[in-house]
Amino acid sequence: MPSILQNATVDGDPLPWSTYRLRSRPRRIISAFPFNHEFDLLEARLYDLHHVVDVFIIQESNFTNAGSANPLRLQEQLVTLPSYIRDKILLIERTIPPAEGFSDGKMADADMRRHLGQEGVRRLSDIRLDDIYVYNDSDEIPRAELLLFLKLYDGFPHQLSLNLIWSIYGFFWQVDPEYGGGIRFDNAVMTMKFFRDFYQYDASKVRTDEFTKNKEMIEKYKAVNETVTPMKVNRAGWHCSWCFHPEVSLLLHRVTSFCFAFCRVSTRNL
């Protein structure tokens, strides 16, 4: 068992080690994330997790969430990867803008994540309900040993909430939780069954508590002794903010790509 799971909790209580059972066959690990310009972190993720992850679903859009043009550049980078990594990648190119437009940045962001989840699942074949769906942003990398344990064992809840080690500008510069808003957990890992039943494969809902509103579905899970309360796992990976080459063009791209409606930025002022 990975050491990080020894202190994992559900509703504040640790799970007994006897809860976990070795599977007769491994389940598939599906890792999905949107991509913008973080080529270095993408390479780190792929090389670190390729031996555990069965499918990487990567979404690239030809427009930003602020509505500006965003040239598709990922395909030409992926061909340089070794085949044992490249063969595990499902690239989704998003070319249809959100129907609501870009005036509401949060809605535009939700449209991006919804497309990632639903279109990615639509293109997969032979999905099993106990497969594991891992949803992160492109600057977040879960620990390989955690995913390997989930791949090989049963006994954990239908979803996991991860606390990631946060750093800025590079993995070497970690943020002290005391000054970084405290220890934060985000829902990020779930069974395909949970993803289907509670979110209809809409990844924009993964980091919310919207599942708690579906009382009828929760009762169905309880009736068969299945837990939907997320298991919290501390220090379950890395979140490296602003970790890319310090070029002005990349900085401008980052700022203008993700600014929501309440935070409009003009490149003329940068």
Per-range role (PLM):
Residues 33-47, 51, 61-63:
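Active-site beta-to-alpha loop of glycosyltransferases that engages the nucleotide-sugar donor
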Residues 15, 20-26, 63-136, 143-148:
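Active-site-proximal specificity loops/subdomain of glycosyltransferases
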Residues 31-36, 59-60, 135-138, 162-165:
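Short His-Asn-centered micro-motif
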Residues 140-269:
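Conserved catalytic core of nucleotide-sugar-dependent glycosyltransferases
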Residues 1-32, 270:
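Juxtamembrane luminal stem/stalk of type II transmembrane Golgi/ER carbohydrate-processing enzymes
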